[in-house]
From Swiss-Prot:
Protein name: Cytochrome f
Gene3D superfamilies: 2.40.50.100, Cytochrome f large domain (2.60.40.830), Single helix bin (1.20.5.700)
Keywords: Chloroplast, Electron transport, Heme, Iron, Membrane, Metal-binding, Photosynthesis, Plastid, Signal, Thylakoid, Transmembrane, Transmembrane helix, Transport
Gene designation per UniProt: petA
Lineage: Eukaryota, Viridiplantae, Streptophyta, Embryophyta, Tracheophyta
Subcellular location: Plastid, Chloroplast thylakoid membrane
GO MF, one annotated term: iron ion binding
Source organism (scientific name): Cucumis sativus
Biological process, per Gene Ontology: photosynthesis
Main function: Component of the cytochrome b6-f complex, which mediates electron transfer between photosystem II (PSII) and photosystem I (PSI), cyclic electron flow around PSI, and state transitions.
Length: 320
């Protein structure tokens, strides 16, 4: 009986330990692993709002450039490259979730016209595969194959991302036509400042929640600070919690105002969006254009030959 109770106790301890470990893992790493563009996928049915704004800007507050390059025109059922460039200073280091410094990651969302989608592996040429590297793209939703996301991936290696795209064929997709279409892109480097629930990340400026005198600053063992602010008028105390990462700007005994920055801004990244246009070209129109050019060239040749023939006739008449 005692052996059975001992076994039950050991089993309970093991179960409790596993549960605690799992909770610690979720609390510690969830903000890191659920990085862009996963947040957008979880919170928004469509990444592009009616205003044209891409929702990634809700969490990545700094504005940074992004560039996209696509062919001017493509034929139906053809694989082509969409190259997204996310430039930034490779020497920069960002504040990680644990407060330490590390390299920047990048991510991108590519919003293609309806019918355009990620090219299947067997249609991608070796040249494009080499440019892609080890990237793994995914659809924003199973029902939205024209919206592709990637990231976070190391910015040092993938500040230029090549998407392999398959153009649609109007012969098999009746809702697709030979037209000029817009393509939208959003790209960011570095961690965001706001989580989807509205809470601030440690990649942010922290401001004073009250005015008064900084009476005490406690540096936490695992990083970060507890700042006690005392209102000189009524003696009320307010404690502001600063997570690991941002650098402190105030000191004990200093008089501060409401919303005054207590820390520096550690953010070195940001988000940008852009657009491009692509024409889905009708092969018959291309053939017609080539035929027209060929006919013009032939007409020019015939005119030159006719002119030379006429000159020979004139020359022979003059000699006669």
């Amino acid at each position: 009986m005692q052996t059975r109770n001992t076994f039950s106790s050991i089993k309970e301890e093991i179960t409790r330990s596993i549960s605690v470990s799992l909770m610690i893992y979720i609390i510690t790493w969830a903000p890191v692993s659920n990085a862009y563009p996963i947040f957008a996928q979880q919170g928004y049915e469509n990444p592009r709002e009616a205003t044209g704004r891409i929702v990634c800007a809700n969490c990545h507050l700094a504005n940074k450039p992004v560039d996209i390059e696509v062919p001017q025109a493509v034929l139906p059922d053809t694989v082509f490259e969409a190259v997204v460039r996310i430039p930034y200073d490779m020497q920069l280091k960002q504040v990680l979730a644990n407060g330490k410094k590390g390299g920047l990651n990048v991510g991108a969302v590519l919003i293609l016209p309806e019918g355009f989608e990620l090219a299947p592996p067997d249609r991608i040429s070796p040249e494009i595969k080499e440019k892609m590297g080890n990237l793994s793209f995914q659809s924003y939703r199973p029902t939205k194959k024209n919206i592709l996301v990637i990231g976070p991936v190391p910015g040092q290696k993938y500040s230029e991302i090549t998407f392999p795209i398959l153009s649609p064929d109007p012969a098999t997709k009746k809702d697709v036509h030979f037209l000029k279409y817009p393509i939208y892109v959003g790209g960011n480097r570095g961690r965001g400042q706001i989580y989807p629930d509205g809470s601030k990340s440690n990649n942010n400026v922290y401001n004073a929640t009250a005015a008064g005198i900084v009476s005490k600053i406690i540096r936490k063992e695992k990083g970060g600070y507890e700042i006690t602010i005392v209102d000189a008028a009524n003696g009320r105390q307010v404690v502001d919690i600063i997570p690991p990462g941002p650098e402190l700007l105030v000191s004990e005994g200093e008089s501060i105002k409401l919303d005054q920055p207590l820390t520096s801004n550690p953010n070195v990244g940001g988000f940008g969006q852009g657009d491009a246009e692509i024409v889905l070209q009708d092969p018959l129109r291309v053939q017609g254009l080539l035929f027209f050019f060929a006919s013009v060239i032939l007409a020019q040749i015939f005119l030159v030959l006719k002119k030379k023939q006429f000159e020979k006739v004139q020359l022979s008449e003059m000699n006669f």
